[in-house]
Amino acid sequence: MKTKLIVVAGPTAVGKTALGIELAERFNGEIISGDSQQVYRQLNIGTAKATPEEQAAAVHHLIDVRDVDESYSAYDFVTEAQAAITDIVSRGKLPIIVGGTGLYLQSLLEGYHLGGKVDQNQVLAYRSELEQLSDQQLFEKIDSLGIEIKEINRRRAIRALELYRFSDNLENTETCYEPFIIGLDDERSLIYDRINTRVDKMVELGLLEEAKWLYDNFPEAQSARGIGYKELFPYFSGEQTLDEALEKLKQNTRRFAKRQLTWFRNRMTVSFYQISSPEYPENVIQDLAIFLNEEEGEK
């Protein structure tokens, strides 16, 4: 029998953390972070990490598991998430994965890994084709497909497009999970308003100080490339005003949210819920109760 688990996905700033905690309390669950930035210790504000109070309300896994100068990959996530799921289930609890890093979630749930089915000649031919494109053309292609990459540069763009193109030919190990994937969504303008408000709130909470510490100590680290930090570096170096840097941060976050939604719609089987609906979140609770074959709210 496959292990049932819940996934709370969606773009940034739609309330994934709050819903995850509510579901953990309602269905006797524990949360696994599915966010590529929340693994880093000392980066709390810019990553929108669950607060100490929120973490006290439900057990959280895969938060604060790396130092800021360490790397983290989809492979690391899959390996550590699988171990966390096994541990959670062994104690009779429900695994609830909460996060917006689509590649991580898909890699875990669909069991993909690079294998012998990929024709390397085809990969090389496609790479040659991509090399003929300008940077702008590559980045437009990335955006149109909803692909998430850590850093917008040519090398990463080409690699991401290769993985996207040949993902259907990757070896697909039989997954042992039966997920119910909740996708949180709303009107685009409302999501953008929430993003803008959240950035302003992050600044009030100390984002500038957190980003400055990262800039002073680990400017080349993988963690420093995440949205929320890199946009502020030109301000610290005197290349931009604070208003310009914050506007860029809001703009990049809005674009990232759009890419996240595109990924979840095109690459995964997701049940979407409008967070502004009067029925939310009770409609989620009801659907999960059915999925888990239990009376509403009981475990």
Curated annotation (Swiss-Prot):
It catalyses: adenosine(37) in tRNA + dimethylallyl diphosphate = N(6)-dimethylallyladenosine(37) in tRNA + diphosphate. Its cofactor is Mg(2+). It comes from the Bacteria. Residues 35-38 are annotated as: Interaction with substrate tRNA. The record marks 101, 127 as: Interaction with substrate tRNA. GO terms for biological process: tRNA modification. GO terms for molecular function: ATP binding; tRNA dimethylallyltransferase activity. It is an enzyme of class 2 (transferase). Its EC number is 2.5.1.75. ATP binds at residues 10-17. Substrate binds at residues 12-17. Monomer. HAMAP family: IPP_trans. Belongs to the IPP transferase family. This is tRNA dimethylallyltransferase.
